[in-house]
């Protein structure tokens, strides 16, 4: 893969750009496989530290910058400079999976918006897109292992692993992950982080 990337950098043309797209997909699948292999005890690799939602979102957007640009994506970031305590690597992976799905299941002129809400014990991150949405029949199963649903079968090759792994990681980090959707209108994924003070009070 490294050799192929060097070749692409040295000779950019429509063919090598298509190869670059496929290499990015391979990178994504490899990352999913590695997380899946460690999913039973992934918390051993956690490094819980102070960060901000803005840092996590920027890191995930950087990873998916090229496919976002190719999809005409326009990320909108609203009031994300909010401190949280979390494992940055795992949270960036989860946000990246959500961005990846927004790209896969987009309509023309992809829009993806990041917004927040805070209360006494929780900080919520909302990630909303204007894509094709998820059917009411599929929505309860989006976190099932291997579930691809109608969208996965019709529009895009899908492993059905990304959201499954994201849910497992979030549970281990005491983050509540949920999905709501209006078919044909878009999808909103919500990550609810416990505040640092709440974690201390709960002894977590």
Q: How would you name each of these model-derived features?
A:
Residues 41-46, 83-87:
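Conserved micro-motifs of the catalytic ATP-binding
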Residues 67-76:
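Short conserved segments within the C-terminal catalytic ATPase subdomain
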Residues 102-103:
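Short helix-loop "hinge" at the ATP-lid/N-box region of the Bergerat-fold HATPase_c
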Residues 129:
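Acidic ATP/Mg2+-coordinating residue in the GHKL
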Residues 134-147:
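Short conserved segment of the HATPase_c
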Residues 147-157:
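Glycine-rich ATP-lid/hinge loop adjacent to the conserved G-boxes
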């Amino acid at each position: 893969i490294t050799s192929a990337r060097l070749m692409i950098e040295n000779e950019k043309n429509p063919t090598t750009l298509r190869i670059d797209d496929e290499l990015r997909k391979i990178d994504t699948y490899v990352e999913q496989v590695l997380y899946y292999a460690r999913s039973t005890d992934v918390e051993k690799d956690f490094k819980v530290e102070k960060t901000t939602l803005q840092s996590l979102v920027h890191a995930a957007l950087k990873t998916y910058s090229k496919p976002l640009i190719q999809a005409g994506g326009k990320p909108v970031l609203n009031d994300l400079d909010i401190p949280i305590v979390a494992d940055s690597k795992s949270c960036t992976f989860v946000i990246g999976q959500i961005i990846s799905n927004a790209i896969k299941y987009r309509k023309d002129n992809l829009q993806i918006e990041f917004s927040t809400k805070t209360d006494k014990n929780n900080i919520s991150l909302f990630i909303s897109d204007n894509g094709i949405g998820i059917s009411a029949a599929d929505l309860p199963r989006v976190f099932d292992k291997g579930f691809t649903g109608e969208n996965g079968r019709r529009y895009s090759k899908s492993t059905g692993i990304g959201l499954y792994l994201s849910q497992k990681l979030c549970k281990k980090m005491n983050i509540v992950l949920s999905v709501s959707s209006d078919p044909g209108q878009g999808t909103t994924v919500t990550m609810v982080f416990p505040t640092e003070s709440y974690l201390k009070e709960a002894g977590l």
